[in-house]
Design a protein with these regions (language model features):
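C-terminal substrate-recognition "lid" of short-chain dehydrogenase/reductases
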Residues: 137, 220-249, 254-255
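Short C-terminal tail/terminal secondary-structure segment
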Residues: 2-8, 105, 154, 232, ...
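Conserved mid-core segment of classical short-chain dehydrogenase/reductases
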Residues: 79, 102-117, 158-161, 200-204
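Alpha-helical segment proximal to the catalytic Tyr-Lys
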Residues: 136, 177-182, 240
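Catalytic Tyr-X3-Lys loop
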Residues: 109-128, 145, 169
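Residue(s) in the substrate-gating loop at a strand-loop-helix junction
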Residues: 149
Length: 257
């Protein structure tokens, strides 16, 4: 844990947060930040051993952490995630929808229909269905944070269709902000490039990594701590008058539609 993480506040004491796909990478970074700020965090991923390992890492930090196996495309597992959270904590204050896949580097018109379906199902549809399950238990003043991507603003060749699904989350954020107001705020973050397992096919290439760094104003890649801080801000009462917005967290990389 770096020095910045020792100076954080306690904005989520008494709050309950669900974060999907949160046993590593950006999802884990968000769970860690929310937990360090006092939230009871419910983490999830597809594999039990990953869930168990991540829960233990959070508990070592003094965080109240609970883990549930959940593949977000599985309706029963989504429902179980919500049901177990409510059974244990009685409410939901924050939902962070982070699960995503990028199974192809093909051009959009060369992408198989089954892959198109998978991208839509995991990256967009599952977020909607998760909120349908969670919404009856969301508290007054609750918050939803979608994890979009810098690719939403300019899909690149190696991740074109992935970028399109992340663009869809920008619209979903706007639409649900209206639909769920005033009880629940809905926002998103659009991370830049972060060296995680999900992005290692890009960030592990030194030439590509350097080129990405040079596209940022800050001349560096992002970190999971950066993403955790941004998501925590939007989920907190510090952002009480912000809804329907997507915060770009990309070191100044060009990012507007």
């Amino acid at each position: 844990m770096n020095n910045k993480m020792t100076k954080i506040g306690k904005r989520f004491v008494g709050k309950v947060a669900i974060i999907t796909a949160s046993t590593q990478g950006i999802g884990f970074g968000i769970a860690l930040r929310l937990g360090l700020e006092g939230a009871s965090v419910v983490i999830s991923s597809r594999k039990q051993n990953n869930v168990d390992d991540a829960v233990e890492k959070l508990k070592v930090q003094g965080i109240d952490a609970f883990g549930v196996v959940c593949h977000v495309s599985n309706a029963q597992q989504r429902k179980n995630l919500i049901d177990q959270t409510v059974q244990k904590y009685g409410k939901i204050d924050v939902v962070v929808s982070n699960a995503a896949v990028n199974p192809t580097v093909d051009n959009i018109l060369d992408t198989k229909e089954s892959v198109l379906d998978k991208l839509w199902e995991i990256n967009v549809k599952a977020s909607i269905l998760l909120l349908k399950d969670a919404s009856p238990y969301l508290t007054e003043g609750s918050s939803v944070v979608f994890v979009s991507s810098i690719a939403a603003f300019g899909p690149q060749a190696s991740m074109a269709m992935y970028g399109v699904t992340k663009t869809a989350l920008l619209g979903l954020t706007k639409a649900l902000a209206v639909e769920m107001a005033p009880k629940t705020r809905v926002n998103g973050i659009a991370p830049g490039f972060v060296p995680t397992h999900f992005a290692d096919f890009i960030t592990n290439n030194d030439t590509v990594r350097k080129a990405i760094e040079e596209r940022t104003v800050l001349n560096r890649l992002g970190s999971t701590d950066d993403m955790g801080a941004a998501a925590a801000f939007l989920a907190s009462d510090d952002a009480a008058y912000i809804t329907g917005e997507t915060l770009v967290v990309a070191g100044g990389m060009p990012s507007r539609l």
